[in-house]
Amino acid sequence: MAKSHQARKTYRPLIALAAVLALGLVVRVVFLVQLERSELGDVLSLDSRLYYDVAHAISTGGALPPGALSFNPLYPVFLAATFRLFGEGLVAPRIVQLAAGLLTIVLIYLAGLRLVEGPRKGKLSGEATAIIAAATAVLYAQFVLYEGMILASAFEVLFLTASFVLALALDDELAGERPVRLGPRRVPPWGSGLLLGALCGAGALGRPNLFFLLIASLPVWLYLRNRKRRRAHVPALSFLVGAAIVLAPPVAYDAARTGRLVPITTHGGINFYVGNGPGSTGVFLPPADVRSGTSAFLEDARAKAEAETGRGMTEPEVSSYYVHKALSYIGANPGAWLALLGRKLLLFFGQDVSDMPSAFLYERSCSVLRLLLVPFAVIAPLGLCGLVVLFRSGRNRSVVSVFLACALASVLLFYVNVRYRLPAVPVLILTASLAVAWGAREISRKRFTRVAGLAAAAIAIFFLVSHRTFVPVSHSASYAFLGNYYLEHKDQARAADAFAEAYRLDPNRAEAIINYARILREQGRLREAADLYARAYAESPRFPLLAIEYGMVLSHIGRGNEARRLFLEATSASEARERALACRLLAQEALAEGNRGEALLWVKRALENVPGDPQLTAMLKQLESSR
């Protein structure tokens, strides 16, 4: 009987885990089917398109973009591997990512078992915490959504959770409680440290700002945790070796391309500036004359830096320029920056700041997402209360503190959105589950006062951070994203509707104004388009191609002198193609006035910007032959 009772106790949590995983599998299969049937199934965000194009180049033996890496390499490498194995479709990577999501749930369960001591008399049950955490992870819609996107988010969450589980296990090992085992064999601390470093190194290839903080913090934690033992430095050193092995290839690649040390990618500087420079609100809001798409964002940021410095710059120099510019602003405005950090902190634990993809769009065609009913607004307050329970227990405080502090700092140093916050969610789910398990135990003991205090704290935190709007959440960018997708697929009518809705939702955003003006121009409503272009130009005169587009509309409605002035301004644009186009339009204006000599000069100047352009070359020959 005793053995039978013990067997039931052993298998009961495993049966519960199997049920949770079965539910997670069903949810993911339904989501994949709905996504593939949806018109959004083939839609790639700007980041996704960049990764797809890079992966295509890798898988077909093509060349990578020149210079240092301007993208995080983890996901393009994974995508290229799936392209090689299964062809260039989106189903295969999505299946792998959804499987990674199920593995993450298992790891969250294992972390829950490690997080608390039980089951022993007077102690919380680790099994209860683990099952609650796994079930919560299944019911969190953002995990499922991002597992279906062509982005690295699923792997970032996986590597963070795996690192957290291994750090908890290593903490138990160093405390002399439970050794780390691989099957029947014990894994020495140096081996665990090596694997932990490799996991963090792999994570840094997808989310450098988070995992580099862990790579800097965990060796210190390992040394301090082990300092009273002989060879206390061994786990910390093995961690650094593991991280270095994984990070060496991209760092060497960047060094060979630039002649200097670059930590994986070169776009950190502009992101740091956007999150901390003048006008920052704590969310992604690029400067008025910088477009928001990944490639365009980096191109415009570089052009802006070169215009402000008056010299050409490499990618690492551009990144350094924006870091120093942001630090100068912070140094001159320390009070404003501290207030901004406080705002970001509340945003981190509060409202969902949408990124692309947006759950708002996908819930319409993937109804299973609406059935996943545990929002971050519930997880965050309970997670913070769970931290109090954890700290009072005295277990694993340092591990949880390191991981949560690094996850928090990685966002606060830049800006807040759902995708950047996502790797922190497993840790908060675990502490939230700990709070729920603790509350259930206290209720069973009739200690209602303690539970009431915890519940009151959770409600207070909810109303402090989750029930307030710190930044207006607009879906304008989502509709602009859809509009560009429809344009790419030659669906002008739906693109027009999407851009009109984007403008209606945010009539003061430069990109929304310009996109809607383009639709009005295509519809022949030139005077209305001119009015919108005028608004956009007054706000962002250096926005790429804006002066040219505005000038073309003015030319068509008979305001040639104003158009010519705009074209002249565009001849000093940062991009050679834009300068060449402005020169060509000035040549056409000169021809319309019968001034062939001036037209010839403008065509020659255009060719100085784009030597060998076939259309301009033909235009030059025609003008020279008719002289």
Identify the function of each model-found stretch.
Residues 108-139, 157-158, 180-185, 394-402:
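Transmembrane-helix signature of polytopic, membrane-embedded enzymes
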Residues 70, 74, 93-100, 132-170, ...:
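Multi-pass, polyprenyl lipid-linked donor-dependent membrane glycosyltransferases
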Residues 73-77, 87-106, 131-134, 146, ...:
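Loop-to-helix entry region of an early transmembrane alpha helix in multi-pass inner-membrane enzymes
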Residues 263-347:
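Membrane-proximal stem/loop segments at transmembrane-domain junctions that anchor or position
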Residues 95-120, 162, 166, 381-385:
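Transmembrane-helix motifs of polytopic, lipid-linked glycan transferases
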Residues 92, 322, 328-329, 336-400:
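Membrane-interface anchor segments at the N-terminal boundary of transmembrane helices
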Residues 35-52, 64-81, 87-91, 261-265, ...:
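Extracytoplasmic catalytic/substrate-binding loops of multi-pass membrane glycan-assembly enzymes
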Residues 3-5, 120-124, 163-195, 221-225, ...:
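Membrane-interface transmembrane helices that cradle and orient dolichyl/undecaprenyl
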